[in-house]
Design a protein with these regions (language model features):
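FIC/Doc superfamily catalytic core
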Residues: 1-332
């Protein structure tokens, strides 16, 4: 069953803007290993801080580096577990209940007795005044609801960006675990995004959620009250765009931005379609690029030569053996 939400013009606009931003980031993110690790640590710190973990970013960094830190043992263990979960989860299948439970086991081992298992009793979410603000699904329905959600997510053809927000929201509403639901919802959205664009493995979306956590919780509550996640989806897409643009500011030194921006919009879309093949293979031929983009051979050849002239691609070989490869961004 399709979860209740509407696809709005605002969502589609944000989806286009995010796609354009991450196309540039995909070209850059592997270049800076230090920045990648720093962003993962920021993600872990922020996701735990949202759940009231009081350790500072500096303390979290030290714990992950294996150093001794003064702090509550439970909070230190949360950091260690989260780091292990983030290191492993991007190998997982986002539509597998077994993998969801395995990730929860990594996230909560040594912290809760029900680690790696769906809850078997009712649970409520309370605000600071002790008022119940949300009641999770009855325990006997949890497995079926998660199963239905994952089956829908696997089959749907809506954009991955929107789908990831829907899954995040629905997991929070189902509240399948006794503890760790918020961390798992955010982690699972990251996994879905990374399966679409690997750069999302390193974009610290949680840092922006932490920054806007009041609105985050308000829109979860609105979606719960209205039984419709539309406003939450729009909010999360804004967060993802802000995170992508923030990350981009730290990677502009790679030199891709200026070169890609010199392409016309139709040429940028052409490049976005052939980029995965360029990245994961030994290059691309004119024929293959034409097949992937639906362009004619002559148009494809012209676009490829434009990319060569901008030092984005390099032409290798002659005549029938000619193919195109990505230039090493580190040289520019």
């Amino acid at each position: 069953m399709r979860p209740p939400f509407s696809i709005t013009d605002k969502m589609l606009k944000l989806t286009v803007e995010i796609t354009q931003a991450v196309t540039l980031l995909e070209l850059q993110h592997q270049r800076d290993l230090h920045l990648r690790k720093e962003n993962r640590i920021r993600s872990i710190h922020s996701s735990l801080a949202i759940e009231q973990n009081t350790l500072s970013l500096e303390q979290v960094t030290a714990i992950i580096a294996g150093k001794r830190v003064l702090g509550e043992p439970k909070e230190i263990r949360e950091v260690q577990n989260a780091y292990e979960a983030y290191e492993e989860v991007f190998k997982f299948d986002p539509y597998s209940i077994e993998n969801l439970l395995a990730a929860h086991r990594l996230m909560t081992k040594g912290l809760v007795k029900e680690s790696g298992a769906f809850r078997e009793r009712d649970v409520g979410v309370y605000d600071g005044n002790g008022t119940v603000v949300h009641i999770g699904a009855r325990p006997q329905f949890v497995y079926g609801l998660v199963d239905d959600l994952f089956k829908w997510a696997k089959k749907t053809d809506i954009p991955a960006l929107i789908k990831s927000c829907v899954v995040h929201f629905e997991l929070e509403m189902i509240h399948p675990f006794l503890d760790g639901n918020g961390r798992m919802g955010r982690l699972w959205q990251n996994l879905l995004l990374a399966k679409w664009q690997p750069v999302f493995e390193w974009i610290p979306i949680e840092t922006l959620v932490y920054k806007h956590q009041k609105q985050y919780y308000e829109l979860l509550a609105v979606g719960d009250h209205e039984n419709d996640s539309t406003k939450f989806i729009e909010f999360m897409l804004e967060i993802i765009l802000e995170a992508s643009l923030t990350y981009s500011k730290h990677t502009k030194q790679a030199g891709w931005d200026d070169r890609i921006k010199r392409l016309r919009e139709v040429e940028q879309k052409f490049f976005a379609k052939i980029y995965p093949t360029l990245r994961y293979s030994q290059g691309i031929t004119t024929s293959k690029a034409a097949e992937l983009t639906g362009k004619t051979q002559s148009t494809t050849r012209r676009y490829l030569l434009k990319l060569v002239s901008l030092d984005v691609l390099e032409a290798v070989g002659k005549n029938k053996d000619r193919h195109y490869v990505l230039r090493d961004t580190g040289k520019h």
